[in-house]
Amino acid sequence: MKASEEEYKLNFFIKNDFKRKICKSCQTPFWTKDDKKEYCSDIPCTDYYFFDINIKSQPLTVKEAREKFLSFFEKRGHTRIPPKPVLARWREDLYLTIASIVDFQPHVTSGLVPPPANPLVVSQPSIRLEDIDNVGVTFGRHLTTFEMAAHHAFNYPDRYVYWKDETTAYATEFFTKELGIPEEELNFKESWWEGGGNAGPCLEVTVGGLELATLVFMQYKITDNGDYIPLKLKIVDTGYGVERIAWVTQKTPSAFHAIYGNLVYKFFDKIGVAYIDETLLKVASRFAGKIDPDNPDTIKIHRQMVSKELGIDIKNVEEELDRAAKVFQILDHTKTIMLMLADGLVPSNSGEGYLGRLVIRRALKVLRLLKSDVRLYELVKEQIGFWKEDFPQVLKNKDYILDAVELEQQRFEKILEKVPSIASTLARKSEITTEDLIQVYDSNGVPPDLLEEELKKKRVKFELPRNFYALVAKRHQTSTIKNVYDKVKLPKDLLEYITTLQPTEKLYYKDQYMRSFEGKVLGIYKNYLILDKTTFYPEGGGQLGDTGLIIDEKSSKRYEVVDTQKVNDVIIHVLKEEPSTIKVGDNVRGEINWERRYRLMRHHTVTHVILAAAKKVLGDHIWQAGAEKTPEKGRLDITHHKALTEEEVKLIENYANSVISDRRPVKPLEMNRMEAEMKYGVSIYEGGVPNSATIRLLEIKDWDIESCGGTHVSNTSEIGAVKIINVERIQDGIIRLEYVAGPALVDYIRETEAKIAEASKIIGTSPDQLPSRLRRILNEVEKKNNLIIQYRRIVETELLNSLKPYEINGNKIYIIEGLNDEEENKEILRKLTSTDNTIAISISDNRLQIATSKNMRVDKIVEELLKGGGKGGGKGTFANVILSSKKSKEEIIDIVRKSL
């Protein structure tokens, strides 16, 4: 959609003598006070010329630029609110915070809940990876991490705050009065914005070739069929670039110098590369507006311009700028890594962790291309020292950040050992596509840049896309939200049936200890029963649905409830049989299986206790990745970058049991979701993100508070005690804890005692003597194993001395029969095939082990053997085969002859 000219013809522009002009280069309309201006002052229509503008403001650091912006709007009636983390954990569809408006999506922007203040101002650290390949090349125009300073106003039908004129007036006042930019240098370029299903006209504020802010007026919803429907809630969504404000006031040769100051020179030094010539950098930066990274020709033209301007050889220009761009990339990436990890990201192969690992590996790749020996964590440590006052969480989580980065580098170095074999596999392809390179990166973690050298050795050419990492990030930057109907295990026709039914009153929230109730039947569909109210808890939040009885008191018929489910606000009782004596409108009595429910309540409550204990022991990066509560045990999956030690597990267990012994009150609360977020932070969403204006929180006094819709005990003492019974790494970056509490702990102890008694009986000892008896048995086994090794050596020597090879076409064929020791077989076959042109086969009934020397291929022999039936296969020089029928030694030799 293109907005009409009237959308931009603001009273503010008319009253303040702004003129509407059309840019001679891009043909875009813009507003300016300069009658003579012909260009929109945005790149690539002009070079960067803000260096030449007389700006009255003193040079501002990022910190000073941020504070100047926030204070300016605070003085003008805006409430300053704290930024959210760079991980968008209040969203189920997005991993990273890409803009300040994300802080308020989807619930504030949809009108479901009010904003925390109106109007408000915030400076939101943001991360966008779609430009990751362009970082450094454009001297700071593209960054992966930046601060979006923003003032927002939410205009409701019954409450107008401010709109286009006031927003434009604020921008003009801030840039001209606060920063001292001459009015005639300020330009408002007409544009259109769309994102997140919303749209509206916008104005891009440009000064001297640099876009400093975007003023978006969100006023349309985009329907599925592409129509634009006016929104009732009209939102002022602005974005001012804090780093660009610092750059325009400092007039440094690159944005990196404005952002990082002396850290730029320190990074060149630590990485071990020469600093770029200052004059070259200044000239290159001035012409950098001409660079369109998606068009490699513009990079070439830019370097030719620099070469011509300075009279320097083009090769020298390219080498200097390439080297500087790589150091700038590492500056940018290490800050992004620091912020991601400080806010709790754990590098992994999926979700947000994948994106974190992508940035880390790209930084490692660049260091490798620069042939630098510096450890990445040393550079991240420098960033922590530089930003610790701006972002206190980076200092608080310093140990985790550095440990995780070093571990990732060690893993990356192991991955690089695979480069030759991966290159060999790729070299067999007739053409290497972008999809092949992405597949290799996704599967093996090997950057294509580092495959290039190996492939060149094999004289294989391939086209490496400039935006490779952006393409990879795009595939992983969002998460698919499941439809509510896809999450439940109920028939579709039932889901249609319940759409007409009223919400079920949740008695389990009024009294979690209620065991029975009376309710009215609202719907019956086969063996599914819906009541007006219930104390049966439906499956959710990892807690199993309740079971119990529905009693028809008219007929005294009792129906077993085998499960309870929920769709939206309707609770469905799943019966073992169809309720033949019950009809809609009847009153029935429900009784839950209380012993089962109480076990679930204990396991659900102790899950919260253990999660908080894990955070205390391991760090703030711990995040719930999944949970399940059954009557028998609880299960909690947490994000963590390495295996837990025995000591860490004990500490978690000790903290949890201490909280149980403390008899801490456990209290459910209901709060406005935005109020809850502002008070407790987004960590309340560890168990999932509810879609409601009011959310239910569970507070364990002075220990934990989290959004949770489950059932819990009212005091930690009711849990009794907890024991962690299993810890395992279930996938990259995820650790699973399993535990038992209350009666389930007693069951576990009894089962363990029974196993110990059985083991003692088997080896003929008592439980208290079991450890010493086992030690004696192991010593005896070890002695016998040593004897077996000696006997194997004797057998091996005898066989090797006695075996005579068959000669076929200059090849030696050895046949071993009747040796059933598989390990010994492998060792003998290996020794026999240590010289070229040798095949060794061990036969045991219809099972064959085959080995060849390195200059031969085992697969041809296997192929010939399997022609007569059977199965098997191998790799390289070794194979296992099971023939469909036993063959004589002579028959096998004959088959081998054919294969040769």
Swiss-Prot record:
CDD domains: AlaRS_core. It catalyses: tRNA(Ala) + L-alanine + ATP = L-alanyl-tRNA(Ala) + AMP + diphosphate. GO terms for molecular function: alanine-tRNA ligase activity; aminoacyl-tRNA deacylase activity; ATP binding; tRNA binding; zinc ion binding. GO terms for cellular component: cytoplasm. Keywords: Aminoacyl-tRNA synthetase, ATP-binding, Cytoplasm, Ligase, Metal-binding, Nucleotide-binding, Protein biosynthesis, RNA-binding, tRNA-binding, Zinc. Its main location: cytoplasm. GO terms for biological process: alanyl-tRNA aminoacylation. It is found in: Cytoplasm. Zn(2+) binds at H604, H608, C708, H712. Binds 1 zinc ion per subunit. Its cofactor is Zn(2+). Coiled coil: none annotated. Pfam families: tRNA-synt_2c, tRNA_SAD. Its EC number is 6.1.1.7. Consists of three domains; the N-terminal catalytic domain, the editing domain and the C-terminal C-Ala domain. The editing domain removes incorrectly charged amino acids, while the C-Ala domain, along with tRNA(Ala), serves as a bridge to cooperatively bring together the editing and aminoacylation centers thus stimulating deacylation of misacylated tRNAs. Belongs to the class-II aminoacyl-tRNA synthetase family. Catalyzes the attachment of alanine to tRNA(Ala) in a two-step reaction: alanine is first activated by ATP to form Ala-AMP and then transferred to the acceptor end of tRNA(Ala). Also edits incorrectly charged Ser-tRNA(Ala) and Gly-tRNA(Ala) via its editing domain. PANTHER family: ALANINE--TRNA LIGASE, CYTOPLASMIC, ALANYL-TRNA SYNTHETASE. This is Alanine--tRNA ligase. It comes from Saccharolobus solfataricus (strain ATCC 35092 / DSM 1617 / JCM 11322 / P2). The lineage of its organism: Archaea, Thermoproteota, Thermoprotei, Sulfolobales, Sulfolobaceae. The gene is alaS.
